[in-house]
UniProtKB/Swiss-Prot annotation:
<keyword id="KW-0325">Glycoprotein</keyword>
<dbReference type="GO" id="GO:0005886">
    <property type="term" value="C:plasma membrane"/>
</dbReference>
<feature type="glycosylation site" description="N-linked (GlcNAc...) asparagine">
    <location>
        <position position="463"/>
    </location>
</feature>
<feature type="domain" description="Cadherin 4">
    <location>
        <begin position="392"/>
        <end position="495"/>
    </location>
</feature>
<keyword id="KW-1003">Cell membrane</keyword>
<feature type="region of interest" description="Disordered">
    <location>
        <begin position="696"/>
        <end position="726"/>
    </location>
</feature>
<feature type="transmembrane region" description="Helical">
    <location>
        <begin position="622"/>
        <end position="642"/>
    </location>
</feature>
<dbReference type="InterPro" id="IPR027397">
    <property type="entry name" value="Catenin-bd_sf"/>
</dbReference>
<feature type="domain" description="Cadherin 5">
    <location>
        <begin position="496"/>
        <end position="613"/>
    </location>
</feature>
<keyword id="KW-0130">Cell adhesion</keyword>
<dbReference type="InterPro" id="IPR000233">
    <property type="entry name" value="Cadherin_Y-type_LIR"/>
</dbReference>
<keyword id="KW-0812">Transmembrane</keyword>
<feature type="domain" description="Cadherin 1">
    <location>
        <begin position="61"/>
        <end position="165"/>
    </location>
</feature>
<comment type="function">
    <text>Cadherins are calcium-dependent cell adhesion proteins. They preferentially interact with themselves in a homophilic manner in connecting cells; cadherins may thus contribute to the sorting of heterogeneous cell types. PB-cadherins may have a role in the morphological organization of pituitary gland and brain tissues.</text>
</comment>
<keyword id="KW-0106">Calcium</keyword>
<feature type="topological domain" description="Cytoplasmic">
    <location>
        <begin position="643"/>
        <end position="813"/>
    </location>
</feature>
<feature type="domain" description="Cadherin 3">
    <location>
        <begin position="275"/>
        <end position="391"/>
    </location>
</feature>
């Protein structure tokens, strides 16, 4: 089979020169293929050679590729090519068929001639080629005359697709003041046309808008800066339009464009600047340290960390600028001027300082642009306030002898009004600091004097608060703390440290140490204590004992002879005179008690006659703690036992069944109904009945104990006659005394008195009043049936009153 190349020109007569040229290319290929023997590799389908005649020579397809132009817009099917078998003699006995991609739909074949036509518009960008198979069969027997051959129909590309930017939107950035040629970003477009055929997919990039500031590489699409002076403060964002054109930019090529957003990033190329060169503030002189005077902010055209700045204060000579300091607000980048020393309007009324602002981060590349700092003058005016008087000094120490007379001068405090008016000052002592009013102060001069006698041994120091206030405005008040030390004078005699008692054996030897004596003195002389010991002048030569002054503020008592006889004298009292060093010299006499005791051979005391001798001993802290712990344990045990007993009693009482007995109360006066029972503890009253039963008596009026009988017998012993003008109170006294004695002897009476006073007729009781004065007079008001609704306890009462009512109404009926 061989093609008919001349058929390829059938549909091209009316084509444009370009399309005609494209169609001629495959025709030239057809001519070349027709003159060249077909290789065996172009004849797939040799597996069907067994269908051919055994003596037939194998033939091969001489054409296996066709071309068809895409985007054909004609009304007639587009001729693709012709397949032809060498065995075709033109008599119509051979039938040509095709199969494969698009066979029968896109591509149709004439069974007689083998002409192939494309019936649909093809798009190479969707599918570039179609693979089909051709068969030549005997029309009568449908037998393959030649092996099936595979061929390809390629869609011939035309420039019908414009370039597209597929990765937009494009956003790039570049630092301001970047040098010319600085790379910003790269953009790339794609073309769906065949890059291997012609120039349909060869793209060229160009800048349509923004060429004054940026350029683009025609081949790579890299965007670069075109100028070195991009300034973010002037323009922060640029919209650059980039165009991609195919056909290598030649005339007739298709193009596509995209917009690239280029953001100019900030660099620190602008120093801080104060909007004005002088700032003025005012503040009261009483403002405490740390008070903010005001805020000042230097402006910076940069953004981000490039605007971070610090502030410094520089004092002008003699302006007192050290009274303020400056801090930086990290959020607002404002300078906060703060008071750091106490201000004084009278000393200085205006403070002038230089405020300097500078960037934290300075880029050395832009150092040639100038210094990145600025200065402004800040003036702070101090306003006057009415200040309280000031003590000079604000605190102090005074001293006074403890034997100073009342009214003696202790010291003088001074305060003055710091204001320019210099108003007079009055003084006083805060009595909360001197509750006993030991000191007084002169209101005009501030002289402090003693108001009472002093005693260093009672209070060696006094802390008082002195008040100073303006004479015409007591609200302006200040305070000063004074410490007054009471100086000691020798006004307390020395005394023996303890009431000394010593014991000596009957067989004591001469010179034996009995007791070492020490002394205490409440005074505290500046040179220290020095005490002297000696026996009293009345007994300077004691035959039994001697006293030795050791000269270290102690003395030793020794025996004078051998042995003592406790039958003759078992106790000796040794008076000792103790003298201090003054001045003035004071003395006192103490007594050492010496007991004569019987001792064993080792000198251990056995007995001291019938007089108990207590050895002087001191308990250690551990022994004291142990003793206290024992006492606490005993107290806790006692409380625990008491609590258990009470709990046991309450438990027993709770187990007793509730007393369901009714209470019948007899009234001889116009009482208050059920409210009379509210003041009684019914369980206590009923205990009388229980106690009487236990004793075998009859609380209801039977035999009773003698105290109860006496009480009952005297129940009506009060005289009932008219009272005399001058009553005999002894009768009442005797009566009450007997009642008290009976109550004390009777164990069954309640442990408290019950005294009732009735000032109403019981209207508040749920049962209303039982008094005849408050009873109803109508028949409806005498209906007692409602008592049955009160429960079983009141049913007998309801029946009783119901029967009484029937008796009263019978005669009437």
């Amino acid at each position: 089979m061989r093609p008919r190349p001349e058929g390829a020109l059938r549909a091209g007569a009316a084509l444009s020169p370009v399309l005609l040229f494209l169609l001629l290319l495959p025709l030239l290929g057809h001519l070349w293929a027709a003159s060249t023997p077909a290789p065996s590799s172009l004849s797939p389908g040799a597996q069907e050679d067994n269908q051919l005649g055994a003596g037939r020579v194998k033939r091969g397809w001489v054409w296996n590729q066709f071309f068809v132009v895409e985007e054909y817009t004609g009304t007639e099917p587009l001729y693709v090519g012709k397949i032809h078998s060498d065995s075709d003699e033109g008599d119509g006995t051979i039938k040509y068929t095709i199969s494969g991609e698009g066979a029968g739909t896109i591509f149709l074949i004439d069974e007689l001639t083998g002409d192939i036509h494309a019936t649909e518009r093809l798009d190479r960008e969707q599918k570039t080629f179609y693979t089909l198979r051709a068969q030549a069969r005997d029309r009568a027997t449908n037998r393959l005359l030649e092996p099936e051959s595979e061929f390809i129909i390629k869609v011939q590309d035309i420039n019908d697709s414009e370039p597209r930017f597929l990765h937009g939107p494009y956003i790039g950035s570049v630092a301001e003041l970047s040098p010319t040629g600085t790379s910003v970003m790269q953009v790339m477009a794609s073309d769906a046309d065949d890059p291997t055929y012609g120039s349909s997919a060869r793209l060229v990039y160009s800048v349509l808008d923004g060429e004054h500031h940026f350029t683009v590489d025609p081949k790579t699409g890299v965007i670069r800066t075109a100028v070195p002076d991009l300034d973010r403060e002037s323009q922060e964002r640029y919209e650059v339009v980039i165009q991609a054109t195919d056909m290598a930019g030649q005339l007739g090529g298709l193009s596509g464009s995209t917009t690239v957003t280029i953001v100019v990033t900030d660099v620190n190329d602008n120093p801080p600047r104060f909007p004005q060169k002088m700032y003025q503030f005012s503040i009261q002189e009483s403002a405490p340290i740390g008070t903010a005077v005001g805020r000042v902010k230097a402006e910076d055209s940069d953004v981000g960390e490039n605007t971070d700045m610090t502030y410094h204060l520089r004092e002008e000579s003699g302006s007192g600028g050290d009274a303020f300091k400056v801090t930086t607000d990290s959020d607002t980048q404002e300078a906060i001027i703060v008071v750091q020393k106490h201000l004084d309007f009278e000393s200085q009324q205006v403070h002038t300082v230089v405020l300097e602002a500078l960037n934290k981060f300075v880029d050395p590349r832009f150092a040639d642009l100038g210094t990145f700092r600025d200065q402004a003058i800040v003036r702070v005016a101090v306003t006057d306030v009415d200040e309280p008087p000031e003590f000079r000094p604000p605190s102090g120490l005074l001293e006074v002898q403890e034997d100073a007379q009342v009214g003696s001068l202790v010291g003088v405090v001074t305060a003055r009004d710091p204001d320019a008016a210099n108003r007079p000052v009055r003084y006083a002592i805060d009595r909360d600091s001197d509750l006993e009013q030991i000191f007084d102060i002169d209101a005009d001069t501030g002289a402090i004097v003693t108001g009472k006698g002093l005693d260093r041994e009672t209070a060696g120091w006094h802390n008082i608060t002195v008040l100073a206030m303006e004479a015409d405005n007591h609200a302006q008040l200040s305070r000063a703390s004074l410490r007054i030390r009471i100086l000691d004078v020798n006004d307390n005699p020395p005394e023996l440290a303890t009431p000394y008692e010593a014991a000596v054996c009957e067989d004591a030897k001469p010179g034996q140490l009995i007791q070492t004596i020490s002394v205490v003195d409440r005074d505290e002389p500046q040179g220290g204590h020095r005490f002297y010991f000696r026996l009293v002048p009345e007994a300077p030569s004691n035959p039994h004992f001697s006293l030795l002054d050791i000269e270290d503020n102690t003395a030793a008592v020794h025996t004078q002879h051998v042995g003592f006889n406790r039958q003759e004298q078992d106790v000796f009292l040794l008076p000792i005179l103790v003298v201090d060093s003054g001045p003035p010299t004071l003395s006192s006499t103490g007594t050492l008690t010496i007991r004569i005791c019987g001792c064993d051979s080792s000198g251990t005391i056995q007995s001291c006659n019938t007089t108990a001798f207590v050895m002087a001993a001191s308990l250690s802290p551990g022994a004291l703690i142990a003793l206290l712990v024992c006492v606490l344990i005993l107290v806790v045990l006692a409380l625990l036992i008491l609590t258990l007993r009470r709990h046991h009693k309450s438990h027993l009482s709770s187990d007793v069944d509730e007393d369901m007995r009714d209470n019948v109360i007899k009234y001889n006066d116009e009482g208050g109904g059920e409210q009379d029972t509210e003041a009684y503890d019914m369980s206590a009253l009923r205990s009388l009945y229980d106690f009487g039963e236990l004793k075998g008596g009859d609380p209801g009026g039977g035999a009773a104990s003698p105290p109860q009988a006496a009480s009952s017998s005297e129940r009506h012993s009060l005289p009932r006659g008219p009272s005399s003008p001058e009553p005999d109170f002894s009768v009442f006294r005797d009566f009450i005394s007997r009642k008290v004695a009976l109550a004390d002897a009777d164990l069954s009476v309640p442990p408290y008195d019950a005294f009732q006073t009735y000032a109403f007729e019981g209207a508040g009781s749920p049962a209303a009043s039982l008094s005849s004065l408050h009873s109803g007079s109508t028949g409806s008001e005498q209906d007692f049936a409602f008592l049955r609704a009160w429960g079983p306890r009141f049913r007998p009462l309801a029946a009783l009153y119901a029967g009484h009512r029937g008796d009263d109404e019978a005669p009437a009926s």
